[in-house]
């Protein structure tokens, strides 16, 4: 307490300050990733009583899905299927909401697959000279980001331009 009052904390305990800052930053990352890590778990429902990622979000005329019925590994076909599904999203009234994918979020083990899918000019793992439509059309314009705090090594996520998508608020910023 004396060190804090006399502003000696940084000179007397330099490593503890850095460790505390790093620990707080990691805590924020873990909490942020927990939204995705728990997104399929029925024990963490959102406002409609379903998990964040569900094939049965209730709307006025039935249900709508924001995930595959059977989860798929990240590859060209599954990414294209997800993009088409996003473009066909419906709101509670059953109207198309005109969303587009913006960014692919992957765990560390999928970063190599994401790099090949997103940045290869030609189709991945084919002998043909076909163009990579994901690349040439900028289907995911903000590319991909590796989140080291995702706990499922084969889970991947697409963020969209939906106006009320993921938001992060800091009630009070960290002080340094």
Role assignments for model-derived ranges:
Residues 1, 37, 106-109:
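Helix N-cap / beta->alpha transition motif
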Residues 1-23, 30-33:
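Flexible, glycine/threonine- and acidic-rich loop/arm segments that mediate assembly and lattice contacts
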Residues 3-4, 43, 51-52:
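Residue-level preference for alpha-helix termini and adjacent loops
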Residues 6, 38, 46, 54-55, ...:
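Generic structural "secondary-structure junction" signal
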Residues 13-16, 30, 37, 116, ...:
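General N-terminal targeting signals
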Residues 14-28, 80-83, 87, 118:
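Short, well-ordered alpha-helical packing segments
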Residues 29-48:
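Short, glycine/acidic-rich hinge or "gate" loops at secondary-structure transitions
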Residues 51-92, 98-103, 109-176:
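Sequence/fold signature of self-assembling virion shell proteins
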């Amino acid at each position: 307490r004396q060190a804090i009052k006399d502003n000696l904390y940084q000179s007397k305990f330099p490593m503890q300050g850095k460790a505390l800052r790093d620990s707080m930053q990691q805590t924020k990352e873990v909490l942020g990733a927990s939204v995705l890590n728990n997104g399929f778990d029925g024990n963490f429902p959102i406002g409609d009583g379903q998990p964040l990622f569900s094939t049965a979000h209730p709307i006025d005329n039935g249900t709508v899905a924001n995930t595959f019925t059977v989860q798929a590994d990240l590859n060209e076909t599954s990414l294209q299927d997800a993009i088409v599904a996003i473009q066909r999203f419906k709101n509670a009234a059953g109207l198309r909401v005109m969303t587009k994918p913006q960014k692919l979020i992957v765990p560390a083990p999928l970063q190599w697959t994401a790099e090949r899918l997103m940045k290869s000019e030609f189709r991945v793992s084919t002998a043909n000279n076909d163009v990579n439509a994901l690349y040439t059309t900028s289907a995911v314009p903000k590319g991909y980001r590796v989140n080291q705090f995702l706990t499922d090594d084969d889970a991947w996520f697409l963020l969209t331009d939906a106006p009320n998508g993921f938001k992060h608020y800091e009630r009070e910023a960290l002080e340094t």
